[in-house]
């Protein structure tokens, strides 16, 4: 009986020596304003879009392989041009921003839906084959707060 207790005690004592060790991890805080993130994984990369409060360029697209090291690879739009107030003519929407973008991937294409805080209260849906490339306006759906693509 003594041998069994000694063997069990040794086994329990040594079990921690073979446990997986925790690696060193640094908090991936970056010098950026990234509110309302929407993130997906496609292949070996994670992609993230977020709100921009001063519109242009707008809706940054970021990419990471490990969720720690991020790079901004593009913007969904460089300018919004369908209303004069986006160019500070006939009023302004400066500081109202576009918010809560929704990022999705389907059948080889990336999609982003967001709504700016302006009238006539219409959203924007953009699409791209390459998220680091040029994004194309696909649709102007009705405005929805924090909308999400399925």
Show the residue positions of the predicted features.
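Carbohydrate-active catalytic/glycan-binding domains of CAZyme proteins
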Residues: 18-150
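Sec-dependent N-terminal signal peptides
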Residues: 4-13
């Amino acid at each position: 009986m003594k041998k069994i207790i000694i063997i069990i005690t040794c086994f329990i004592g040594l079990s921690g020596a073979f446990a997986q060790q925790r690696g060193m991890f640094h908090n991936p805080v970056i010098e950026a304003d990234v509110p309302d993130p929407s993130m997906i994984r496609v292949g070996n990369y994670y992609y993230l879009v977020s709100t921009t409060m001063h519109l242009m360029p707008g809706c940054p697209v970021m990419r990471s392989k490990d969720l720690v090291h991020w790079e901004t690879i593009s913007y969904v739009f460089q300018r919004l041009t369908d209303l004069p107030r986006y160019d500070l003519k006939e009023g302004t929407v400066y500081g109202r921003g576009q918010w809560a973008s929704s990022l999705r991937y389907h059948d080889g294409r990336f999609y982003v839906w967001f709504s700016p805080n302006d009238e006539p209260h219409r959203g924007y849906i953009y699409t791209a084959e390459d998220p680091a490339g040029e994004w194309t306006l696909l649709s102007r759906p009705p405005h929805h707060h924090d909308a999400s693509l399925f």
